[in-house]
Amino acid sequence: MKASELREKDVTALQAELGERLKERFNLRIQQATGQLARPDQLRKVRRDIARVKTVLNEKTAGKA
């Protein structure tokens, strides 16, 4: 997901997106721990998506404060 796509969303949509990504990361970490993770690069991709969402969320909340 691109940051430009995230900037078009509102704060509630970004928070929902963050929740989804955190759940996805949790599931991938469980798969990794049990040796079932077929593509380890997915974990890195989700981690970076979480960072992008958090960055855009902080930009939006800092703009309102």
Curated annotation (Swiss-Prot):
Provide the Gene Ontology terms for cellular component. Answer: cytosolic large ribosomal subunit
Which keywords annotate this record? Answer: Ribonucleoprotein, Ribosomal protein
InterPro entries the record matches: Ribosomal_protein_uL29, Ribosomal_uL29, Ribosomal_uL29_sf
The family note in this entry says: Belongs to the universal ribosomal protein uL29 family.
- Domain of life of the source: Bacteria
Q: Which organism is it from?
A: Alkalilimnicola ehrlichii (strain ATCC BAA-1101 / DSM 17681 / MLHE-1)
Q: Which GO terms describe its molecular function?
A: structural constituent of ribosome
* Cystine connections: none
Write out the GO biological process terms: translation
- Return the PANTHER family for the record: 60S RIBOSOMAL PROTEIN L35/50S RIBOSOMAL PROTEIN L29, LARGE RIBOSOMAL SUBUNIT PROTEIN UL29C
Its recorded name reads Large ribosomal subunit protein uL29
What Pfam families is this protein classified in? Ribosomal_L29
